[in-house]
């Protein structure tokens, strides 16, 4: 982990901590912390312009800082496994990720789109998967979606073919799941 006044400076400092230069084509997951989430555009643009970046590099947000994430070493393999599972249409038929080349970086305006959020329990240092999605306009976050709202967003944007809803009606738990949904 490293910090800098620019992306290039932070990456240079991170490279100095290693015994060899990182090869970005090996990376499938880009984690952006709370500082980067205020305006993700420069980070996504940097890696989209990086010739060595993998074409399917998927970006995720995390509420943890680099220091907090480094304290959760036990769950890093879970994060990588979940990220790899979510890249592309998963078994739940929901495509929660986009590669950095699919994300709409509209000129100088910045990111217009969404990024999934990896959830963690800081106290228990436990990884909890993707439970939220942040919507961005001109690079800045403007809405956080969870549960049914997140699923509906994916469905309406052609990124899901099923919908699972769990709710309460008059004190009773109601659950339903639809499959093979197709918008026409």
Q: Where in this protein do the model-derived segments appear?
A:
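Membrane-proximal alpha-helical signals and transmembrane carboxylates
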Residues: 1-184
């Amino acid at each position: 982990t490293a910090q800098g006044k620019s992306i290039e400076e932070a990456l240079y400092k991170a490279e100095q901590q290693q015994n060899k230069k990182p090869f970005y084509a090996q990376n499938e997951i880009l984690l952006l912390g709370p500082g980067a989430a205020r305006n993700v555009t420069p980070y996504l643009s940097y890696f989209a312009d990086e010739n060595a970046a993998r074409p399917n590099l998927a970006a995720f947000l995390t509420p943890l800082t680099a220091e907090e994430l480094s304290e959760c070493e036990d769950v890093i393999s879970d994060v990588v496994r979940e990220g790899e599972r979510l890249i592309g249409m998963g078994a739940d038929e929901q495509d929660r990720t986009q590669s950095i080349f699919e994300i709409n970086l509209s000129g100088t305006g910045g990111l217009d789109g969404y990024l999934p959020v990896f959830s963690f329990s800081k106290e228990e240092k436990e990884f909890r998967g993707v439970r939220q999605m942040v919507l961005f306009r001109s690079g800045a976050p403007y809405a956080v979606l969870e549960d049914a709202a997140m699923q509906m967003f994916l469905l309406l944007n052609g990124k899901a073919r099923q919908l699972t809803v769990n709710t309460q009606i008059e004190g009773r738990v109601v659950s339903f799941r639809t499959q093979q949904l197709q918008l026409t």
